[in-house]
Amino acid sequence: MNLVRTGQFKKDYKRIKKQGEDLEDLRSVIKMLVEGKPLPPEYRDHTLSGRLKKHRECHIAPDWLLIYRIKGDDLILERTGSHSELFR
């Protein structure tokens, strides 16, 4: 699977890094997704609804989310951050 990072994801990633989050957790989840492996239940991976119905969300930590979608052979990383940062 090809990994695609949106411009917004890149901004979110820089912000998360600046906040001192452990990026290894995020990298681990991304690696599983790229390899096509199902995420373990503790990540609470699920489909979103409404305008984001083509997207999925998983929890890196209790209040740290990754929003992504799969289109063909592409894993598109859309956003990462807390609930309040992503759903204003």
Predicted region positions:
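Active-site glycine-centered loops adjacent to acidic/histidine catalytic or metal-binding residues
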Residues: 82
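Basic, Lys/Arg-enriched alpha-helical interface segments
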Residues: 1-62, 70-76, 85-88
